[in-house]
């Protein structure tokens, strides 16, 4: 397998090219580390759990486990985005206008009729309400979303929600890089259908998964796309605590934005 790679030991921004077949490191489909969106697709798709994520959420290989199947490279969204092909894959036709709007059938403005979801959401609770409807009606058996870690509440993490209360805990914006697609592992480990609320780069990885492993991707039956203006480094929350002189052990909860919509930073 030839191409650029992330070295499993160095953890640097160096990339390797022209990888020999017996090289003890991973060939991943991005030409430089700065193109890695840290979506977690490579780690999530690996059937051998041969890819882990470092503290900054970059992929790192466990060489002894790697079978060189190539799935990690096949699903990586970092190298390029072909909007025309994506549109044709999802909607059966390419964009007519050539812009970034995509295929828009109709535009709506709304909010959740559940007061708790409406007040706790980043913008009216529509995403959570839709996901709860899918879960409550049995359309899906779980939902891939995010939350703040219970033991380390300054760290955001992806998780599988299966109850109303877990969905409530997932509400709100988290301004940090969260490798959502590592949860593809759940598609292999548990039966049933799942939904996901994911960002564009993560969705791009999923579309590539649909081509690389249609059977596995078919388990994720509903995708709710979220807007994104960019994500901040995972260390941001820790740095904010340090600037304010707050000990991590004293933190019971961490919210990037609190109060009723639109909230306060």
Predicted regions and their residues:
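Ferredoxin-type iron-sulfur electron-transfer modules and their immediate structural context
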Residues: 2-45, 49-52
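Iron-sulfur cluster-binding cysteine motifs and their immediate structural context
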Residues: 18-19, 37, 41-61, 71-92
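Immediate flanking context of iron-sulfur cluster ligation sites
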Residues: 26-34, 57-67, 191-195
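Residue-level marker for well-ordered alpha-helical positions
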Residues: 30, 40, 60, 70, ...
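Alpha-helical architecture
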Residues: 38, 68, 199-200
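Glycine-rich loop at the start of a catalytic domain that most often binds anionic cofactors/ligands
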Residues: 66-71, 158
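Iron-sulfur-associated redox domains of electron-transfer enzymes in respiratory
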Residues: 85-265
């Amino acid at each position: 397998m030839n191409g650029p790679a992330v070295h499993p030991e160095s953890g640097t921004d160096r990339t390797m090219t022209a990888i020999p077949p017996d090289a003890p490191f991973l060939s991943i489909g991005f030409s430089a580390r700065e193109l890695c969106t840290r979506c977690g697709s490579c780690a999530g798709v690996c059937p051998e759990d041969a890819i882990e994520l470092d503290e900054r959420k970059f992929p790192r290989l466990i060489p002894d486990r790697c079978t060189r199947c190539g799935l990690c490279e096949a699903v990586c969204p970092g190298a390029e985005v072909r909007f025309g092909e994506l549109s044709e894959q999802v909607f059966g036709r390419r964009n007519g206008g050539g812009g970034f709007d995509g295929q828009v059938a109709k535009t709506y403005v709304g909010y959740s009729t559940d007061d708790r979801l409406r007040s706790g959401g980043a913008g009216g609770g529509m995403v959570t309400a839709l996901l709860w409807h899918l879960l409550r009606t049995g359309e899906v058996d779980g939902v891939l979303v995010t939350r703040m870690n219970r033991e380390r509440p300054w760290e955001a993490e992806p998780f599988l929600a299966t109850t109303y209360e877990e969905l409530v805990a997932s509400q709100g914006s988290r301004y940090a890089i969260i490798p959502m697609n590592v949860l593809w592992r759940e598609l292999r480990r548990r039966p049933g259908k799942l939904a996901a609320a994911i960002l564009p780069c993560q969705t791009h990885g999923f579309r590539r998964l649909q081509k690389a492993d249609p059977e596995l991707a078919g388990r994720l039956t509903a995708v709710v796309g979220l807007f994104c203006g960019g994500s901040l480094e995972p260390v941001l929350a820790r740095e904010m605590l340090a600037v304010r002189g707050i000990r991590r052990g004293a933190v019971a909860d961490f919210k990037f934005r609190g109060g009723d919509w639109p909230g306060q930073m």
